[in-house]
Swiss-Prot record:
PANTHER family: CHROMOSOME TRANSMISSION FIDELITY FACTOR 18, DNA LIGASE. Its EC number is 6.5.1.2. Residues 638-727 form the BRCT domain. The gene is ligA. It comes from Streptomyces avermitilis (strain ATCC 31267 / DSM 46492 / JCM 5070 / NBRC 14893 / NCIMB 12804 / NRRL 8165 / MA-4680). NAD(+) binds at D44, A45, E46, F47, D48, S93, L94, E124, R147, E184, K300, K324. The active site is at K126 (n6-amp-lysine intermediate). Residues 1-23 are annotated as: Disordered. One of its GO terms (cellular component) is cytosol. It catalyses: NAD(+) + (deoxyribonucleotide)n-3'-hydroxyl + 5'-phospho-(deoxyribonucleotide)m = (deoxyribonucleotide)n+m + AMP + beta-nicotinamide D-nucleotide. The keyword GTP-binding does not apply. GO terms for biological process: DNA repair; DNA replication. This is DNA ligase. InterPro entries: BRCT_dom, BRCT_dom_sf, DisA/LigA_HHH, DNA_ligase, DNA_ligase_AS, DNA_ligase_CS, DNAligase_adenylation, DNAligase_N.
Length: 730
């Protein structure tokens, strides 16, 4: 056939090729152990001998000297590219049961559809971590990938190989030709606080919870960073397999253990639903005896042939279900009720409680929303209170334990003045429940919160500019004059201005100084200089990142200005319609209101913001510093908008896009992104844990795209995307 490529004859003997492959594999393995794991198993001399043998072989047979040969690579240059890879067998989600009725209904469906009474349930703890898929071929780990959208994940093989529990080679008997091993990578609870303390000390943002810590650690571009994190894994399933057959999942777990894989210690085979209930109840009471966070209990049909008989829906197996525990509640002492000041001046009461462990993390503070909520809950300072926390949700005070009062409790009185700047508090308008500090410009608390928000990922995305840096720049102990009186001078910061700054190390939740655990004294730090007075690396990086932020798109600039009611979605709508900060300023309130995605509340807030002279001064200073204040394309010269007229809903967690990034990609191509599914919806894009929007789309037969289909929509348009949409259930 024309254009067909024919294999070229080769003069390299087969035994030379085999020897070359063996040497290359050995050298790569030893390099990985030396540069990434920092745990070499051969001496430098032995390694050099291997490398010289490979070089000699390539000298004799030049055809073997390919670009990917170890002789052609720079040692130590390991970096994960996170390329997309296809799972051989799809990684499904799980349906959930939140109460005994839901669990019993699932068990009843299993009993009805399985066609026999001879079956068992396998119960195991649901690890709250990052799902991964390991591929072993002839016993050797050839690939590790994240779950992604279930069909396509990211290749994280070098990073996973740094986890000591995951074997590079399987050991023992009955090793299959191919097997996919599914599991969860997690961050141990006891190490989580240590990591966050180090991150804060370095000026980086701490992780919200151990699951995020596991995901962030595993997705480092440099595997050497991953190697420093105490990651662990629990294996909980099998995907595609060749040369491997087994009758029961519990037996498979035993075999996986023999192969050297880390299976769960918290699993039990039971005969019936009562056994399932006993397992759930036991770990409901003993969940904190487990070294990792748990997200519930997974109940599976143990017999693998019967699993195949029940099959799966388009998103979850019918033979398994996840039991979700109710949010955990504990009693603790309400030490005080303080007030915090937010970036828009809103003054919010919050509870300071005796430290207590709940839902896997230690809690010292909880939200109380406003003074009316404090009254409605009936809590007094000194009360024993009931506190609830679920996952990474903000802890909440439910109410007092009235029977434990001893008469020393006292009522909370909302302060009349701002606790940070002393300005009298007042409602923003008549009838408002919330009180606000009207001193927006010079209140250090408001500026601190605005700067922290401005540096966040949804705004200017300035890495190394964390809460400690924002506090130090707005209310230092030294010098007396804060380096930043408002946002206007942000882009004029220099290392010389940063070095002398001393400040309290503030807690992000409370805004209070942290205390040394040994001495009890409030922590003070020279934030940007080391003990020798030289710049810290994070200070230099912060200034570099501030400079890079000058080139952010207009929508992110608008978000960073903290205009009330203007979040990322409204900012994108304004930027898309007006293309420059000046045109937004010059637009009438009517023009703003009529803009798609804006409306009267946002329009009024924008006009009110630009009416302040000091806000205009920020814009002037940023322009002078070179901050980009308009998008490059004009409305007349706008590029093609292939998704014009489409309405798209995005739900669940995407692997290759943040939620905001997905919206930006759709909106820049002309699509309208909404938050609810209807018959008018063109496509629903689903990631991990999509929830009810996915179900609604299936019910209405709206085309549903996984992340691979989403890529087709962006790159090839709606017609091509429709062809790869997920099948709707009949």
């Amino acid at each position: 056939m024309a254009g067909e490529q024919h294999a070229q004859p080769t003069s390299v003997p087969a035994e030379a090729r085999e020897k070359h492959a063996q040497l290359a594999e050995q050298i790569e393995e030893h390099r990985f152990r030396y540069y990434v794991k920092d745990a070499p198993v051969v001496s430098d001399a032995e390694f050099d001998t291997l490398l010289r043998s490979l070089e000699a072989l390539e000298e004799e047979y030049p055809e073997l000297r390919t670009p990917d040969s170890p002789t052609q690579k720079v040692a130590g240059g390991y970096e994960t590219e996170f390329t997309a890879v296809q799972h051989r067998e799809r990684m499904l989600s799980l349906d959930n049961a939140f109460d005994d009725l839901g669990l019993a209904a699932w068990a009843e469906r299993v009993a009805k559809d399985v066609g026999t009474s001879d079956y068992h349930f396998l119960c195991e703890l649901k690890v709250d971590g990052l799902a991964v898929n390991l591929t072993y071929e002839h016993g050797r780990l050839t690939r590790a990938a994240t779950r992604g959208d279930g069909r396509t994940g990211e290749d994280i093989t070098p990073n996973v190989r740094t986890i000591a529990e995951i074997p590079d080679r399987l050991k023992g008997d009955r090793i299959p030709d191919l097997v996919e091993i599914r599991g969860e990578v997690y961050f141990p609870m006891e190490k989580f606080e240590e990591l966050n303390a180090r991150l804060v000390e370095a000026g980086d943002k701490p992780f919200a919870n151990p699951r995020n810590a596991a995901a962030g650690s595993l997705r480092q571009k440099d595997p050497r960073v991953t190697a420093t994190r105490p990651l662990h894994m629990v294996v909980h399933g099998i995907g595609a397999r060749q040369g491997f057959d087994i009758d029961r999942l519990s037996q498979a777990y035993e075999l996986l253990r023999e192969w050297g894989l880390p299976t769960t210690r918290y699993a039990r085979v039971v005969d019936d639903l009562d056994g399932v209930r006993e397992f759930i109840a036991y770990y409901g009471e003993n969940r904190h005896s487990v070294e990792h966070e748990i997200d519930g209990v997974v109940v599976k049909l143990d017999e693998i042939p019967l699993q195949g008989r029940l099959g799966s829906t388009s998103r979850a197996p019918r033979w398994a279900i996840a039991w979700k525990y109710a949010p955990e509640e504990v009693n603790t002492k309400l030490i005080n009720i303080r007030v915090g000041v937010g970036r828009t001046g809103r003054v919010t009461p919050y509870a300071q409680v005796e430290p207590v462990t709940v839902a896997g993390s230690e809690v010292e503070f909880a939200t109380l929303h406003n003074q009316d909520v404090v009254k409605a809950k009936g809590v007094l300072i000194g009360d024993t209170v009931v506190l609830r926390k679920a996952g990474d949700v903000i802890p909440e005070i439910l109410g007092p334990v009235v029977d434990l009062r001893d008469g020393t409790e006292r009522a909370f009185v909302m302060p009349a003045e701002c606790p940070e700047c002393g300005t009298p508090l007042a409602p923003a308008k008549e009838g408002d429940v919330d009180l606000r500090c009207p001193n927006a410009r010079t209140c250090p608390a408001q500026l601190r919160e605005r700067l922290f928000y401005l540096a966040g990922r949804k705004s200017l995305d300035i890495e190394q500019f964390g809460y400690v840096a924002a506090a130090a720049l707005t209310k230092p102990l030294e010098p007396a004059e804060p380096p930043l009186l408002d946002e206007g001078d942000l882009f004029d910061l220099t290392i010389e201005r940063l070095l002398p700054i001393k400040a309290y190390v503030l807690d992000q939740d409370s805004g209070l100084p942290k205390r040394d655990p040994k001495t009890g004294e409030e922590k003070v730090a020279t934030v940007f200089a080391n003990q020798q007075g030289e710049p810290r690396k994070n200070a230099i990086s912060m200034l570099d990142n501030i400079a890079a932020a000058k080139e952010r798109p207009l929508a992110r600039i608008l978000t960073g200005l903290s205009i009330r009611h203007v979040g990322p979605v409204a900012a994108e709508a304004l930027a898309r319609a007006f293309r420059s900060i000046d045109r937004i300023d010059q637009a009438t309130e009517e023009e703003l209101k009529d803009t798609d995605g804006v409306g009267p509340i946002v329009a009024a807030a924008v006009k009110q913001w630009f009416a302040e002279d000091w806000h205009r001064e920020i814009i002037r200073k940023w322009k002078a510093a070179g901050v980009r204040m308009e998008d490059e394309r004009s409305g007349e010269d706008e590029g093609p908008r292939p998704l014009e007229g489409l309405t798209v809903v995005v739900t669940g967690t995407l692997e290759h896009h943040t939620r905001d990034g997905a919206k930006e990609a759709l909106q820049s191509r002309g699509a309208k992104v909404t938050g609810s599914v209807s018959k008018k919806t063109s496509f629903v894009v689903v990631g991990d844990n999509p929830g009810s929007k996915y179900d609604k789309a299936m019910q209405l037969k709206v085309p549903v795209l996984n992340e691979a289909g989403f890529a087709v929509l962006l790159e090839q348009g709606p017609e091509a995307a429709a062809e790869v949409a997920l099948p709707t259930e009949e």
